[in-house]
């Protein structure tokens, strides 16, 4: 889920270049912000990145797979969570899950789920137990990620910058609409699965390792 399995040469050049620029800008800012973090935080980043990589390699149906992005966002926060998303997407690209040119866009799409997860969880945790708060956090985080994915698809369907600025590509808009209509049921299925997994893991951590939770 929330990952573009698109080969190199398909997306407009300007789009994936912008994706790389934004992804590396966010990664540089996160690296600078966390430059004095404790070593165990980096260990947790590596461990959760490995879990995310494994989850994203196992499909649960057409078009979708688990991502563990909400869980990673809750445990690591927006900055380290985005670094995990970037590293995982780069590794998946080397394994053939999408081209190298879409790594930046994939990091942004997955980062859209990671970044809001901890703030939303903290807000919900004031009124809910960890498991239930995690489930609702997963739904909200993945909604942001799917929205980012649809934005990328819509921009890709517009083709070059001239078509985008002219806003006259009706065929591209229709193609985007068909994709949204076709894919929505699969996103719902994946979101439910992600919410259940996130809820289960957070409930477990709350009992055995509560210090890991924000």
PLM region descriptions:
Residues 17, 42-47, 67, 82-86, ...:
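Hydrophobic alpha-helical transmembrane segments
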Residues 27, 106-153:
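Short helix-perturbing small/polar motifs within transmembrane alpha-helices
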Residues 18-25, 111-120, 189-203:
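Hydrophobic cores of alpha-helical transmembrane segments in multi-pass inner/ER membrane proteins
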Residues 25-35, 120-125, 205-209:
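Structural signal for the C-terminal ends of transmembrane alpha-helices
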Residues 2-72:
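Hydrophobic transmembrane alpha-helices
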Residues 135-142, 146, 163-214:
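C-terminal transmembrane helix-loop-helix hairpin of multi-pass membrane proteins
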Residues 55-114:
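Alpha-helical membrane segments and adjacent membrane-interface helices in multi-pass membrane proteins
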